[in-house]
Amino acid sequence: MIARRRFRHRLEYGAVRGLGALLVALPHRCALAVACGVAAVVYALASGRRREAARRVRLVFGESLRPVDVSRICWTSFRNTAFNAVEMIRIRKLSLAQMEEMIPELPAAVASLRELMARTGGRGLVVALPHMGNWDLAGSGCHLSGLPIFSVAGRQRNPMMNDLLNRLRSGHGMDILERGGGALRQILERIRAGQVFAILPDTRSPTPDLLVPFLGGAANLARGMASFAYAAEVPVVPIVMRRRGWRHFTLTLHEPIWPDKTAPKAVELERITKTVATIVDAAIHETPEQWFWYNRRWVLDPVV
């Protein structure tokens, strides 16, 4: 069993590296075209994942969407995920000028974040980036712009793929902490030292936490994002990224959510988490095809 698993891991790693080498060698738009074709084949074959994504979309939007609209949302979300992978595989080839051409609002966003950091007395920020646009690319763009940004990621089952993903995510030097161990302490220390912590706020916590209204249901969201902001006395800044066409993006910075240290901690953690969830909910309803509907942990599933 162990030998079979190792063989499968090597096969997966080899296939990804081989395809990755091709995508790096091609011009950017050609690489996206290849990814679009591969995504179309996989999408046609992955009927179970496709049906589950459609079920989720219908659960959120009910009868307000036609079947053709549901299909469009599911396909665009899937295709954009393939595009995200291409951009991360090619991340080392992207200069700051190219990043700013792809994300025109990047310089203004970084400037706004720096202004906020100047108001925290030498501390950093917590940035809430939902699964929209290319959230990894947004973090890399901020780091390439000189912003001391870092994030945390879970460990993949395939150790070779885990190392590869971390190398890609840190392609321009962005620090990635591995979830678990002493990561929680490190996150708080880094924020207090003036770094920016980027976190995905729209994933279901695997253990009971805060039940928050989200997408027409109740989502069990982790209070960690709000806890770090409260403990470090820094704001949470929700940022929504959207793909425009094949290779361009928009960035929308929402008003910072400052913790109120005079209020009870539990009340503040719930308020901050709910405020971010409301912003993300509105963004998903506005452009549902931009959100990632294929997460294995569906955000509205109850915690068992």
Predicted segment positions?
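Active-site metal-coordination segments of metallo-dependent hydrolases
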Residues: 50-51, 155-159, 218-222
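Catalytic core of membrane glycerolipid acyltransferases/transacylases, capturing the structured
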Residues: 122-181, 204-210
